[in-house]
Amino acid sequence: MAWRLFGCVMVRRAASARVDLSQPGRRAGPDNFHMSPASRDSAPSLPHSIKVACSNCSLRELCMPVGLSDDELARIDAVISTRRRVKRKTALFRSGEKFHALYAIRTGTFKTCVNAEDGRDQVTGFQMAGEIVGLDGIVNDQHTCDAVALEDAEVCVMPFDRIGELSREVGALQHHLHRVMSREIVREHGVMLLLGTMRAEERLAAFLLNLVQRLQARGFSRSELVLRMTRQEIGSYLGLKLETVSRTFSRFAEEGMIEVHQRHVRIVDIERLRGLLSQPGSPM
């Protein structure tokens, strides 16, 4: 059974070029593996009233059902009518806010987190372009976590009441929403398994392998990763201390499985990474 860790990475669609998305269009080299020095201020996210056409979006097959007729696509286009820009380190929504919409990520990456009893932010997931955030708000009409942009991002706003109405008329859309919700349940079960049974090496290997899997689904490189989360955030998600994450990255590099240059990771020996998992084919 396959499940997904919501690790997050963005690279430009290219067969061999390494790209630093902190500066779009710029090829990554030794001097620009760093993240962009974008503003860290928590300025509010900016609504952006640009008409969005799902029918023309390159990510359509990732966040929308396939096989829709032109009429069905036009009806969805009419519902998903605006984009919203979110600055780096700014929240798309916060825990406790009223739930209004789901958000399909067009560009950028997000982390979801909850406030732990000791005041720390506990990372519960990472989301990338083509994925949907906001599902947590459906059950009680309010969000139960924060969704924070790890880089400047843009989302499509999907008003839930209108999506719900349309899904009752367009069977493929309803089925797709059910699949998205089911996938989130499976993901949460997978994370529980990871935290409860896997050693540190297995957790990090599963995390990196998941990034590769998600990149391939988008036609990106299967080996060049630019991580958008910090190692501390990775540790929070995987239930590991920062020192353990850093030590495990170093071990993987020393053993020739990966090459690491700050946030740039190159998978050198994917089969050895897979071999670290105690149960081949287990959740990753």
Where are these regions (language model features)?
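Phosphate-/nucleic-acid-contacting segments
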Residues: 32, 213-284
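Cyclic nucleotide-binding regulatory module and flanking cytosolic helices
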Residues: 32-88, 132-133, 137-139
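Glycine- and acidic-residue-biased ligand/ion/polar-headgroup-sensing regions
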Residues: 89, 100-113, 129-130
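Short phosphate-coordinating micro-motif centered on Lys-Gly-acidic
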Residues: 91-97
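Cyclic-nucleotide recognition modules
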Residues: 123-190
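Polybasic "coupling" helices that flank or enter modular domains
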Residues: 168-241
